[in-house]
């Protein structure tokens, strides 16, 4: 399997991108990586780490898409950018997956306009995995589509279901519709229409779910439009980050707290690991005609290595074909 990696995307590119790629080719069999970006910079990083293998190559790209550029314009105008070059490798069949920690908006535009959508899929959705009290959960969509139709949400649910079953090995994952209340009649026109459609599918649909219940692990796939999803995601990340800061501050405020903190250090370490985004790799753009993984902007080497593992599993489990097959079932049932 060949994986295209945007070597210039993210806060720590190209250093930690290269480090993650080296770790991946050493750990995972059957992968070859093409790093796109400024050849001299990437080669220097490989040389610094004394990499002498033949599983990593460089494709030169002189331009870089920054996070403050208009996404669609950047994708269309910067043809020699590391992100576009990586996407084009997948489009041309020269790679089977693309990974980038660069601009989310630009990668979304690239997944849509360079890779294209799977036939019959209305919108590509961003579907991050997050740690929950019982097990990881997915938000679909987490920001790619601010305005949605009810049928889009059904497709998001289907693609999330495929990901859980194929990639994570979870049979019959639960699907919940994010809403302001659990009752069927709650919500706006979109959620009411989506509820009716989801109820008619063969998904393990548990009904409406309030945002507060998502981290409790009450649902595997939380379905919503991108505006709601991104708000839930950012709130969750903010609360998790501040919780650790507040806890540390309270522990260090007294001698008793310091002693208790020292005794509980292994517990805190395990607890913090559960909230470590690097464990999950990245967020897949589901619905694109190619495997496309968005790594976190602040990804370290471990996160890149795990994103590469994630891409490999998606490829091995034939996730694109599985989405196509499941989409056919929806169409047959007029949903």
Curated annotation (Swiss-Prot):
Highest taxon of source: Bacteria
Lipid metabolism in keyword set: yes
Catalytic activity from the UniProt record: a fatty acyl-[ACP] + phosphate = an acyl phosphate + holo-[ACP]
SUPFAM superfamilies: Isocitrate/Isopropylmalate dehydrogenase-like
Keyword annotations: Cytoplasm, Lipid biosynthesis, Lipid metabolism, Phospholipid biosynthesis, Phospholipid metabolism, Transferase
The EC number(s) this enzyme carries: 2.3.1.274
Pathway per the UniProt entry: Lipid metabolism; phospholipid metabolism
Name of the protein in question: Phosphate acyltransferase
